[in-house]
Amino acid sequence: MTKEVLIHQIIDVLARAGFALSDRCNIRPRSFDVAARKDDTLLLCKVLFNIDGLNEETAREMKYLAEYLGGSAIVVGAKTRDQMLEDSVVYMRYDILALSVQTLYDYFVENIRPLVSAAPGGLYVSIEGDLLKKARTTQSMSLGTLASMVGVSRRTISKYEEEGMDASIDVVLHLEDIFGVELAKPIDILKSCGSRKPRKKAEPEKEEPKGKPGTLLPEDLILNTISMLGYDVLPTAQAPFKAISRDKSSVILTGVSEFNTTVIKRAHLMSSISCITETQSVFIINGRSKLKSVENTVLIEKKELDTISDSQELLDFIEERKDTHEA
């Protein structure tokens, strides 16, 4: 299986599950490959044939983007190290949840939650602690007796009941056989990969500008200007846009560049993503712009930005330009 085949499979699964999808991100490097939304569920999906290809920098950006946009970041792949990903198993890479296409299908199409998570040392299952304790006490069985039957310590059984420790698959099967009840706790993928309340505030690690203030790049100066309008600005390194700008009432995918053919290409992609993320999309042009907008992405010249005094005025400017374009 190639990565291209994998991407098409993922898109097919999400579409079948009822998700609306953005255009594919065709830039390099990229922190995510496609954005998808179904009702209040927003996914930023990174596709990697080998999930170990995810690095810490990309994972960090995925988490911050998802947090700013009120969504969840996931990785979908086919293998890890020298073996294929197991179905119905979830993996973690730098606090980003990773899974196979089949697990994605089971969860979003069939509504079947996985039961097993991979961790150093093997595969583990979370136990329904209340059910275990109820089953044990109903049979008047002591912690010590159950521990001896399963081959673990009394403290371990206590931890299982408190849901403070996962168990191996063999232990869970043994416990279920003893009591005749299902004890494995299904994994909620959205919660596990950090499904957050919309517009929750993120706290990215902000890098200090290199050199003296006067040596800031033009793009950084423009982002500073947007920040002074009242926006919380999250710079990006691997997204189709330069930053996400956010205040209490709006979120803006923000591009910054001189006008060129690449800007038009990125503006198209930003427009598609903004429709899925339900945000505004703006490209600040450092110099003259030959266009006023590209689909839903509004192009604003730097000199026009300099005449705007606050975030509401910027939003009004964006809406006015959109209306003019649609007319």
UniProtKB/Swiss-Prot annotation:
Record Pfam families: HTH_3
Gene Ontology molecular function: any one: DNA binding
Top-level taxon in the UniProt lineage: Archaea
PROSITE patterns: HTH_CROC1
HTH cro/C1-type domain location: 132-190
SMART domains, per the entry: HTH_XRE (SM00530)
Keywords: DNA-binding, Transcription, Transcription regulation
Record's signal peptide: none
Residue ranges of DNA binding: 143-162
Bias (Basic and acidic residues): 201-211
Residue ranges, annotated region (Disordered): 195-214
Protein name as annotated: Putative HTH-type transcriptional regulatory protein MM_0444
Species of provenance: Methanosarcina mazei (strain ATCC BAA-159 / DSM 3647 / Goe1 / Go1 / JCM 11833 / OCM 88)
